[in-house]
Amino acid sequence: MPALMVVGCTSHAGKSLITAAICRLLRRQGWRVAPFKGQNMALNAYVTASGGEIGYAQAFQAWAAGVEPTIEMNPILLKPQGDMTSQVVLKGRAVGRTLAERYYQDYFEVGWEAICEALEQLQADYDWIVCEGAGSPAEINLKHRDLTNLRVAKHLQAPTLLLVDIDRGGSFAHLIGTLELLDPDERSLIRGFVFNKFRGRRELLQSGLDWLEERTGIPVLGVIPWIDRAFPSEDSLDLMERRRRKTQAEVTIAVIRLPRIANFTDFDPLESEPSVQVRYVGLQDELGYPDAVILPGSKTTISDLLDLQRSGLAQAIRDYAAAGGTVLGICGGFQMMGQHILDLEGTEGIEGQFEGLHLFPTQTWFTAEKTLRQRQTTARSPQAGLPITGYEIHQGQTRLDSDSEEFLPIFDDPKLGLCDRNGNLWGTYLHGIFDNGAWRRAWLNSLRHRRGLKALPTSIGHYQAQRDDLIDALADAVEPYLNLSPLLTAL
């Protein structure tokens, strides 16, 4: 069946977004398209309808293709936990932790088998597969055990686009160097070059493009301009670049940039609000006095909690809350807000009982069992009756110490989260909570009320519609500058 692959000379070349754009462009032509990434290393994850865990980037690409995300689209997900260890998620399920030096010894064979099984299923279900590589396909020390780049392209005999980030400089050297390091059978799969993130006029680049085509015999199929839109990021390093100030912002929200922050795509809907300035605060930064503080999810909640305490930021958050500030915790952040976290089995690698922030009268117990599921519920606060969707990804269960009337469930299912009666403290296990437009606006209005600001309308839809518009804008921005015709005609 037809398949394309996108690989990059480096990490952060833009592979994920270009893959998403191609998925949307093929969908517009009437094809049923599946994205695929054999192995992804990321802390942003999504739970499929079947209860499996995949990288959020592959879920985003599936939405670009207009299909439901499935575990076959990302059969191996590695979730870094620090100290050169990662949790291994195989076919949607966590199967253990591994050291980097042990991973390929323990998982290479079973991983390649999972990749082949996933591709076979996708070939049966879809017209096209658009594959994304990882990092660079030319890492000499890793090529013999690379599961996700040109091994996949060779398996599918997929024509491959080699993508380079021209904004970094050295793009011609990157392209030529990558080609030189590929084996002949790998090099034969490279059918086109794509320059990404170009700022300037193409005619100033043309002499270099002509030289490249003459030198390699491979056509340049795209020179894609810099796209100045806020698309989902896979790497927390990208958060450091999100410093754009909104002149019309009336509310400021500080998201704590934990060392192992996870699922920070939760905040894309907040960043889409023109009146909201989202500021990512590192452990060495001043908290200040924003309108709200959010403690996000974490892949290693205990380690991040200890780092938060050592930095002094934990005390700053407690002082902020004591002064009447609003604090919201999601998943690991919710767990941190309690009295204690107990990990008696060393699920995260550190055994013991650990002091939380003492903002909620809750205790959290970690167990080896991981909760993975999509959820539908109804809100009780800040506005009752709102339909809510989201998903859970967590290890551990949280219990309220007492039947205190000071704390109320946020949703019909009280296990999903709680808040205090004053609306200052919020905690939930639900990822994607801000995707629910009416709930997001109701929560923001509680912050605006304290500032004496006019309430925002709450009769808005789910963020899914905005995300789809964003994907359309991405495809519209890419289409004039990416010539897929030679590949599509050949296939």
UniProtKB/Swiss-Prot annotation:
Entries under CDD domains matching the protein: CobQ_N, GATase1_CobQ
Pfam families referenced in this protein's UniProt entry, alphabetically: CbiA, GATase_3
Keywords for the protein's UniProt record, in alphabetical order: Cobalamin biosynthesis, Glutamine amidotransferase
Pathway: Cofactor biosynthesis; adenosylcobalamin biosynthesis
InterPro entries: Class_I_gatase-like, CobQ/CobB/MinD/ParA_Nub-bd_dom, CobQ_GATase1, CobQ_N, CobQ_synth, GATase_3, P-loop_NTPase
Coiled coil: none
Lineage of origin: Bacteria, Bacillati, Cyanobacteriota, Cyanophyceae, Synechococcales
Active-site residues from the entry: C331 (nucleophile), H431
Species the sequence originates in: Synechococcus elongatus (strain ATCC 33912 / PCC 7942 / FACHB-805)
Protein name: Cobyric acid synthase
Domain GATase cobBQ-type: 250-439
